[in-house]
UniProtKB/Swiss-Prot annotation:
HAMAP family: ATP_synth_gamma_bact
Protein name: ATP synthase gamma chain
Pfam families: ATP-synt
Localization, UniProt: Cell inner membrane
Gene Ontology CC, one term: plasma membrane
Record keyword Transport present: yes
Organism per entry: Enterobacter sp. (strain 638)
Superkingdom of origin: Bacteria
Amino acid sequence: MAGAKEIRSKIASVQNTQKITKAMEMVAASKMRKSQDRMASSRPYADTMRKVIGHLANGNLEYKHPYLEERDVKRVGYLVVSTDRGLCGGLNINLFKKLLADMKVWSDKGVQSDIAMIGSKGVSFFNSVGGNIVAQVTGMGDNPSLSELIGPVKVMLQAYDEGRLDRLYVVSNKFINTMSQVPTLTQLLPLPASEDQELKQKAWDYLYEPDPKPLLDTLLRRYVESQVYQGVVENLASEQAARMVAMKAATDNGGSLIKELQLVYNKARQASITQELTEIVGGASAV
């Protein structure tokens, strides 16, 4: 059994670690609330854009934009939103598993994949397991802006425009609540038709001023950008929630470990005192 001094040192070490994890839990909780506010403020715009695009996809348009037309799929692209930091449980690995599963489905059909990665954890993971990363952005911090995302989005849209990609997805974690974050894979291009039954039963006609082409060119790009940005802010809220839960679990585990070490320490003290008493009694008997 370890000596009392060694056990006291272990207890002190665990207590110091526990203070760190508790502080990280509180910081993550504060950042999560801010991320939730940012997510809530951007969600109405993203949802409205999704509805407008759903109308367009179901509509009888005089100008058929390339983003609305289905193609034979020979190559797919993924805009993947991961985190820059760890200590957030299985948030990233669950997302990567979902992505790899979808990539395998396409690979079995002879379709290749390109990845535009957001977040350093995703870059590290796919550099190690293998993946064709064509664009990346890292270090966006806790307050990401749309301008920081333009690079990867532009690369993928250009590839789609030039026919080098036939389908484009955004992959990110959807924030449900503090305890639940769900990895999601959403098709961006070609634009999926709305699942709203009311829209499917109606024929939509549109009048454009002055001309449909420049309007749709701008609107559809804004749609893609808005969905990627929404994925980033939701993933950030998911990251902070997962980190808060992970740090709380670490703090609680530290408390349990301290109790176990305290019990071992008490037994060691008891054994030490018993041994000293035995030596004293033995010495007295010898006299």
